[in-house]
């Protein structure tokens, strides 16, 4: 017998086999889902169940006619940090650019200083408060980056917090090493030396402690060059660790081509990519991870080329980019709305972007992100007219029930 059977539900599966021009969500109406050992054992129309529900499962839950979706996947966040940067918001409103703030010691570096000055336990506590809000908004899988430590001790501190969050809270955590996020003051004007430090000192220790699921970098004129990022990617390849990259957010610096050449799981931001870059992403099978929260918050005017991604069949993901300086957001449904209104993505595209494609961007497409047989039962029950409503509300639309790893969780 199954452990659990859900009945009286409508399901938006995000299953490519069910998605069509007429139905971009992969819907099954009047559906049922059987769960065993935390995984989906059966899904389909309730009329096709092989026996009476009471003969199939130890527990039966009724969805009372509501909508079930996959748990949401937030595949790009900087949620592990201490400190506050709300005053920078006022500076930006007065015309100070992101680059200017960064160059005078604000931006990322101010968060680095705050993060360095708290203990691991304190960092866990402030991070857990944010993550609980994300969970309440429907996130069941969460990418968490380092990059606010920039020393051996403090990068490991962030990565240990990521692992601890995944143990303490009902969320699947993908931990990303982002040591190449900014240049710390200790290495002023010595970027190459700092990259060597990342490769020879920090990365081996993080790998030894099994703290890393992927490696990221910030390739931009205020951060690191393609040549410097390539050194990091070579080290990642040697260790068989997948890579991803912040690229083409503020200018076209060549990072996207580099990421495609190394088969990156995703390249993120992408406001300044051109068609040749998009073609490279298509050939590599790399996800274009779009971050409308940052676009909105820093009042960027150049949009990522969504039409080119469609033209070349590049999968488009969405994430909150939750961070203290450019995207203080914990709501993936709010991000879905921004993607529709700012980037002209369709509601159907945004749904796939925060489920199946978000999982693909983390290399977890065979684990989570869709409601199909064999997938982990990460599921959300919503009081909606239909899945299109998820991208309609400007955030604040929360699930009424939550299933993580097959277990019914209280909505936090």
Curated annotation (Swiss-Prot):
Cystine pairings recorded for this chain: none
UniProt similarity note: Belongs to the metallo-dependent hydrolases superfamily. HutI family.
Residues at which 4-imidazolone-5-propanoate binds: 85, 148, 181, 249, 326
Record: residues binding N-formimidoyl-L-glutamate: 148, 323, 325
Keyword Cytoplasm assigned: yes
Localization terms from the record: Cytoplasm
Keywords: Cytoplasm, Histidine metabolism, Hydrolase, Iron, Metal-binding, Zinc
Residues annotated as binding Fe(3+): 76, 78, 246, 321
Protein name in the entry: Imidazolonepropionase
Lineage, highest ranks first: Bacteria, Pseudomonadati, Pseudomonadota, Alphaproteobacteria, Acetobacterales
Residues involved in Zn(2+) binding: 76, 78, 246, 321
Main location: cytoplasm
One Gene Ontology term of the molecular function aspect: iron ion binding
EC number of this enzyme: 3.5.2.7
Cofactors that this protein relies on: Zn(2+); Fe(3+)
PANTHER family attached to this UniProt entry: IMIDAZOLONEPROPIONASE (PTHR42752), IMIDAZOLONEPROPIONASE-RELATED (PTHR42752:SF1)
Pfam families registered for this protein in UniProt: Amidohydro_1 (PF01979)
Pathway the protein acts in: Amino-acid degradation; L-histidine degradation into L-glutamate; N-formimidoyl-L-glutamate from L-histidine: step 3/3
């Amino acid at each position: 017998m199954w452990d659990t059977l859900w009945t009286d539900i409508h399901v938006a599966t995000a299953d490519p086999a069910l998605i069509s021009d007429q139905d971009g969500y992969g819907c099954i109406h009047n559906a049922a889902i059987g769960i065993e050992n935390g995984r989906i054992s059966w899904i389909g129309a309730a009329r096709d169940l092989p026996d009476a529900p009471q003969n199939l499962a130890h527990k039966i839950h009724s969805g009372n006619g509501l909508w079930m979706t996959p748990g949401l996947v937030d595949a790009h966040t900087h949620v592990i940090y201490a400190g506050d940067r709300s005053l920078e918001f006022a500076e930006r409103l007065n015309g100070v650019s992101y680059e200017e703030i960064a160059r005078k010691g604000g931006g990322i570096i101010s968060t680095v200083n705050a993060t360095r000055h708290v203990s691991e336990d304190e960092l866990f506590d402030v991070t857990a408060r944010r993550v609980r809000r994300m969970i309440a908004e429907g996130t069941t899988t969460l990418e968490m980056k380092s990059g606010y430590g920039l020393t051996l001790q403090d990068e490991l501190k962030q990565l240990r917090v990521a692992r601890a969050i995944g143990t303490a809270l009902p969320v699947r955590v993908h931990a990303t090493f982002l040591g190449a996020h900014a240049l710390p003051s200790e290495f002023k004007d010595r970027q190459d030396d700092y990259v060597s430090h990342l490769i020879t000192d920090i990365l081996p220790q993080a790998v030894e402690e099994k703290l890393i699921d992927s490696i990221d970098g910030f390739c931009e004129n205020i951060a690191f060059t393609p040549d410097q990022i390539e050194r990091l990617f070579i080290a990642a390849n040697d260790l068989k660790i997948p890579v991803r990259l912040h690229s083409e957010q503020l200018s076209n610096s060549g990072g996207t081509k580099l990421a495609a050449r190394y088969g990156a799981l995703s390249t993120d931001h992408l406001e300044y990519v051109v068609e040749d870059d998009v073609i490279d992403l298509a050939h590599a099978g790399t996800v274009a991870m779009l971050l409308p929260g940052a676009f909105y918050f820093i009042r960027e005017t150049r949009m990522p080329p969504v039409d080119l991604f469609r033209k070349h069949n590049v999968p488009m993901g969405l994430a909150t980019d939750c961070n203290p300086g450019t995207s203080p957001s914990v709501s993936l449904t709010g991000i879905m709305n921004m993607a529709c209104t700012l980037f002209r993505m369709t509601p159907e595209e945004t749904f796939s972007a925060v489920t199946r494609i978000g999982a693909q961007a983390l290399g977890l497409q065979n684990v989570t992100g869709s409601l199909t047989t064999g997938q982990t039962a990460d599921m959300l029950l919503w009081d909606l007219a239909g899945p299109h409503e998820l991208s309609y509300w400007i955030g604040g639309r929360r699930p009424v029930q939550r299933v993580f790893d097959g277990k019914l969780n209280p909505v936090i």
